[in-house]
A protein has these predicted regions:
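Extreme N-terminal cap/leader segments of soluble proteins
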Residues: 1-57, 76, 85, 100-109, ...
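Acidic, Ser/Thr/Pro-rich beta/coil linker or hinge segments at domain junctions
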Residues: 3, 7, 175, 252-283
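Residue-level signal for inorganic ion chemistry
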Residues: 30, 69, 77, 116, ...
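Glycine-rich anion-binding loops of enzyme active sites
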Residues: 35-38, 45, 79-164
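Short, ordered loop/turn segments at secondary-structure junctions
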Residues: 44, 85-88, 120-122, 159-160, ...
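Small-aliphatic-rich amphipathic alpha-helix that forms the alpha element of a beta-alpha
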Residues: 58-82, 103-111, 177-180, 184-187, ...
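Active-site-proximal betaalpha loop/short-helix elements
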Residues: 92, 173-238
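Short hydrophobic/aromatic beta-strand micro-patches
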Residues: 135-137, 242-246
């Protein structure tokens, strides 16, 4: 059996027996260190899959790579403290390309007062690969995907589809992770997720982990300027968060209501015929 066609969720089920208790259900690991909870996440960025130097500067690539990694911390309400960065690069790279990537990461790290604490380097005969591990702490255990309940409300922090518009128009997209918003929303007791693979795909991940379904109202999904409806539903690499919780908590948070959770463990989009539900590396 090949990987293609199994999907990321299917692959996760195959490796779950080899993971620690509770691991694999969320994009970030949450580990109690005796005093607080460490939130840590790792992301890979592959040239030709996640970024393209033909229309992105090295600094743009570095910024976006760190920003997307930090989205997992934002979803758990953790302020970033440090990152480890590993780079595999072809021998043909110019030195300025490497330093430019790090410059972009440094700018964003400085914005959040975090540190690039180390990493590793290697050569490769294939495309370049960046691997970023990011970490921070929270004082309480954030809700996991598996914790959501039927009858809860689904909300988003803002308009979706900006990343898809940037990709379509080949424009650099320097998103800013909603770290402080994530802290606030988690303190309200909401289960949050970053929209790295699209809104519908993120809800499919919540459903797979919780065995709780969802009905999304396409007409209620706020769209970024220039974004088509399908782009708002499926665009990944978005800065916004999707949050799930009791209706009063979602409305108290001031979120845009886009749906509700259901007993049946499937995700239904009302008002749109989607050709795809979002990005999946192994679909």
């Amino acid at each position: 059996m090949s990987l293609r066609g199994l999907g990321e969720l299917g692959l996760l089920e195959r490796i779950r027996p080899y993971l620690g208790p509770g691991a694999g259900g969320d994009d970030a690991a949450v580990i109690h260190d005796g005093h607080r909870f460490l939130v840590a996440s790792v992301d890979m960025f592959v040239e030709g899959v996640h970024f393209d130097f033909a229309w992105e500067s090295p600094a743009d690539v570095g910024w976006r790579a760190l920003a997307l990694a930090l989205g997992d911390l934002a979803a758990k309400g953790a302020r970033p403290e440090w990152a480890l960065v590993s780079v595999a690069m072809p021998h043909g790279w110019e030195v300025d390309r490497l330093t430019g990537v790090y410059e972009g990461m440094h700018w964003l790290a400085a914005h959040f007062g975090m540190t690039i604490a180390g990493g590793d380097m290697s050569s490769t005969a294939g495309p370049a690969v960046l691997s970023l591990t990011v970490a921070g702490h929270v004082d309480h255990r954030p809700l996991a995907r598996a914790d959501i309940k039927p009858g809860w409300t689904v909300g988003v922090t803002g308009p979706l589809g900006a990343a898809a518009v940037a990709l379509r128009e080949r424009k650099a997209w320097r998103l800013l992770p909603l770290i402080e918003e994530g802290v606030r929303l988690n303190r309200l007791g909401l289960a949050c997720g970053d929209i790295s693979d699209g809104l519908v795909r993120e809800m499919e991940k919540f459903s797979a982990m919780s065995e709780v379904g969802c009905i999304l109202e396409a007409a209620s999904v706020p769209r970024a300027q220039g974004a088509e409806l399908e782009e708002a539903l499926t665009s990944g690499e978005e800065a916004e968060l999707v949050c799930i919780g009791p209706d009063e908590a979602i409305r108290e948070a001031g979120l845009e209501v886009v749906g509700r959770t259901t007993e049946e463990a499937e995700v239904i989009v009302v008002g749109s015929e989607l050709e795809t539900t979002g990005y999946d590396h192994f679909a």
